[in-house]
A protein has these predicted regions:
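Nucleotide-binding/hydrolysis machinery
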Residues: 1-21, 29-32, 36, 58-63, ...
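Conserved post-Walker A coupling segment in P-loop NTPases
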Residues: 12, 25-91, 102-118, 146, ...
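Conserved RecA-like P-loop NTPase ATPase core
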Residues: 23, 45, 68, 82, ...
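Small-residue (primarily alanine) positions within well-ordered alpha-helices
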Residues: 31, 51, 104, 151-152, ...
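Bacterial C-terminal helix-turn-helix
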Residues: 37, 46, 52, 236, ...
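Short gly/ser/thr-rich secondary-structure transition/capping motifs
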Residues: 88-95, 131-136, 159, 276-277
Length: 329
């Protein structure tokens, strides 16, 4: 049963990059332990998927998995939604409302964007972690709950502690172990693996018999883009591009990075032609992106013969190998 449930998440947890495989290994070690876990990662890196994996590989897998985005609610609503409220606790509270902790009893509660939680909620979270008890808003009777807490953020929580915006004692309790998710730009070897998987899934959704594959130009575009939205953005871009490509038997050539443009370009603006990118920009990121594209182009032109690719770039073989390792190519 657990393997069946995990199947719905595995497609977005594909990867061969060492940094990603190390995360999966860490999660497998953490899952059986009944301890809080903190997941750190940029938007779109799959923080909730990791929380799901922690749940379904644990002894709690038959219990509920409940999630809540703390940034989606104001302070009062977040308090009520997490811990529940009694009838008459506030205007409009006509009946008792069980909170997410009660609903997650015996299972796992995943809290995304934890850094946005106000101090009052942080104090209550600490009490649940330490004593396994809470009080509904407007109530006076303590309730016992048995919940594993997995929290996620992209904020610098230690710095927030120093600035007085996050409780040091709560961070200590949450950070039994910290899972750091690498951004997609640091998983170059996984981009095409994921892109092909998303393309095949989209073809099935559209009722298309097969996916004809990506052209060299499309591949260069996918590998050369920085993916600020990470896996979520890659999935959206690939699905959009497959949809626009339709049932053509030719390789997919046009990658639609920006659907708001009248004419969809198949290469990022900063990477097309000899035009300079718009300012302001992050020069270091731009240089890394251009270096990556040149490495990819030399490999393609040399048909992935690394000594020939090194000659095309005026490098020694060992210099090329060092750059390929640097860019995870």
């Amino acid at each position: 049963m657990a393997k069946f449930i995990m199947a719905q998440y595995k497609d977005n947890l594909l990867g061969e990059a060492n940094s990603f495989l190390e995360v999966l290994e860490q999660v497998s070690r953490l899952a059986p332990l009944d301890k809080p876990v903190l997941v750190i990662g940029e938007r779109g890196t799959g923080k909730e998927l990791i929380a799901n994996r922690l749940h379904y590989l644990s002894a709690r897998w038959q219990g509920p998995f409940i999630s809540l985005n703390c940034a989606a609610l104001n302070d009062n609503l977040l308090d009520s939604e997490l811990f529940g409220h009694e009838a008459g606790a506030f205007t409009g509270a006509s009946k008792r409302h069980p909170g997410r902790f009660e609903r997650a009893d015996g299972g796992t509660l995943f809290l995304d964007e934890l850094a946005t939680a106000p101090m009052l909620v942080q104090e209550k979270l600490l009490r649940v972690i330490e004593y396994g008890e809470l009080e509904r808003v407007g109530g006076s009777q303590p309730l016992q709950v048995n919940v594993r807490l997995v929290c996620a953020t992209n904020a610098d929580l230690p710095r927030m502690v120093e600035e007085g915006h996050f409780r040091a004692d709560l961070l200590d309790r949450l950070a039994f172990d910290v899972v750091q998710l690498p951004p997609l730009r640091e998983r170059q070897s996984d981009i095409m693996l994921l892109a092909n998987q998303f393309a095949i899934q989209m073809c099935r959704e559209l009722g298309l018999p097969l996916f004809p594959g990506f052209s060299e130009r499309a591949t260069a575009t996918l590998l050369g883009y920085r993916w600020p939205g990470n896996i979520r953005e890659l999935k959206n871009v690939v699905e959009r591009s497959v949809y626009r490509h339709g049932d053509s038997e030719h390789e997919l050539d046009a990658i639609i990075l920006n659907p708001f443009r009248q004419t969809a370009a198949s290469v990022p603006e900063a990477a097309s032609g000899d035009e300079l990118p718009a300012l302001p920009l992050d020069l270091r990121d731009f240089q890394l992106q251009q270096e990556t594209r040149l490495l990819q182009r030399s490999l393609q032109q040399a048909k992935y013969h690394q000594k020939q690719a090194a000659e095309l770039l005026g490098l020694t073989y060992h210099q090329l190998r060092a750059l390929l390792k640097k860019h995870q190519l």
